[in-house]
Amino acid sequence: MAVSDKEPVYGIGPTLLSASVMSFAILGDALIYVVLPVNAAAFGITIFWVGILLAANRIIRIFTLGPIGLLAQRISPRKLAIVGAIGSTISTLLCGIAEGPTILLAARLLWGLSFAILTLVIYSYAVSDRRKAGTNMGWSRAIHSVGPSLVLLVGPWAAIELGPTNIFIWLGIITGLSLPIAFLLPKEGRKIKSKKNRWFPKPKRFDLFLLIIGLTVDGIFAIGITLTIAESSSVGTAMITGGALIGLRRVLEASLSPVGGILGDHFGPNRLLLISTLLLALGFALLTADFPLIGGFCVVVARALIAVLWPAEIARRT
């Protein structure tokens, strides 16, 4: 992507505001990884569909970034944020009122599109000053992680009291708060301009890298924790414990993101991404060798660093 020199350079304010939109928008997605695997029957689906639904939002992002990038050339980040806030609210509400795989799949695909849009909005504000792109992305990731951290710690308790589906109706209402925040963003913003106007660009190796990270850490790791606990305890205990463990990842992510962003600006995000990936591989190796605490900690720390470093790496490449 090429950026015009005439585009405005923003301070940290719009970046943090856009991250706040994401913090509310992502509430339903954060909790569904804990609730859905052990409550599949309540949603009218089988465990087979659990895997599909939790992966659908990531897969669609790979093939829609081209169209979204073209859309971003025509409208401001503020308008994109409003669209993303509306989409995420509808998606979360659908997870609460829908039953069966068809509507749930539509909800997850809608969330994937909304997440891609909001990520692009944060990116557009954060990299307006390329010298501080990593730092800005680090702070935005910290704000972005507040909502998921809280919902993973409190949400499982609420799901037990309200029911595994009703909790998403309440989360949908809370997610609606992202809309007024989106309206606070600057009316004119830095628009992303693509080098090639391709609607469906061929996924690059870095795109596949991010997909693998998402499927292994956010998918298999998160689902595996919850299902493993459910085998030896109750569903409620599995949700609470799984939520606490995944919530810890979010808390560490929020804590490490500013540091990771600053280090990325100083040493280069590509080097730190390599180190983080090696740490991630080490973590999974330790997990398979029956060292769950050390292995899980390595996975959590590596995932937190990758989360903040990949946008800075994209900014460096464009």
Question: What are the roles of these predicted feature ranges?
Answer:
Residues 79-93, 172, 271-286:
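Structural signature of the two symmetry-related core transmembrane helices
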Residues 64-76, 256-268:
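Helix-to-loop junctions at the C-terminal end of transmembrane segments
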Residues 91, 102-110, 294-302:
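Paired small-residue
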Residues 109-144:
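Cytoplasmic helix-loop-helix junction between adjacent transmembrane helices
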Residues 44, 76, 97-102, 268, ...:
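Helix-breaking motifs and short loop linkers at transmembrane-helix boundaries and internal kinks
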Residues 270-310:
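C-terminal transmembrane helical hairpin of 12-TM major facilitator-type secondary transporters
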Residues 34-48, 223-241:
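Short amphipathic helix-loop junctions that connect adjacent transmembrane helices
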Residues 10-38, 202-221, 297:
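Pair of pore-lining "gating" transmembrane helices in MFS-fold secondary transporters
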